Amino acid sequence: MRVIVAGAGGDGRSCVLEERDARFDEVLPGLAAFGLFNTSETPPPARPPGRGELVDLGVTAGLCIWNLWRHAPGLEVPMHHTDTLDFEVILEGSVELILDDGAHLLRPGDCVVMQGADHAWRAGEQGCVMCALNLGTTPRS
């Protein structure tokens, strides 16, 4: 299991900003936690404009939607960006997260924090099921 935090780099291109393997710390006997990501303000700030299509998920700043997404085998979702901070967990199958810096293969247990940057998806041979929580950010001006 690992977490990938993706967003826009200093040049405005989408990239992996951080990648870590899960390392659990015991908080109580027999109970351990691994911190994936923290926000510092609510609603989260506006994200830089992307070059891909803006997909409006209809999420008001500070509110969220929570979905399971099933990607058919080989499905390609074109490059796009959203006005959301997304938290995704791969549950079944595999999928490539495609950023301006390349393709990143994700398998069950992998987690992604997508900070509104350009990205695309390409499902593996068995398809993919992911759980996604999308938190609305402040709209871009």
State where each predicted segment sits.
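A short, N-terminal "cap"/entry segment at the start of jelly-roll beta-barrel domains
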Residues: 1-69
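Short, surface-exposed charged micro-motifs
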Residues: 4-5, 87, 111, 120
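Short acidic, glycine-rich loop/turn motifs
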Residues: 8-10, 99, 123
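Ligand-binding loop in jelly-roll beta-barrel domains
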Residues: 49-52, 62-64, 72, 96, ...
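A short beta-strand-loop-beta hairpin characteristic of the jelly-roll/cupin
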Residues: 76-108
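Active-site scaffold segments
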Residues: 88, 113, 131
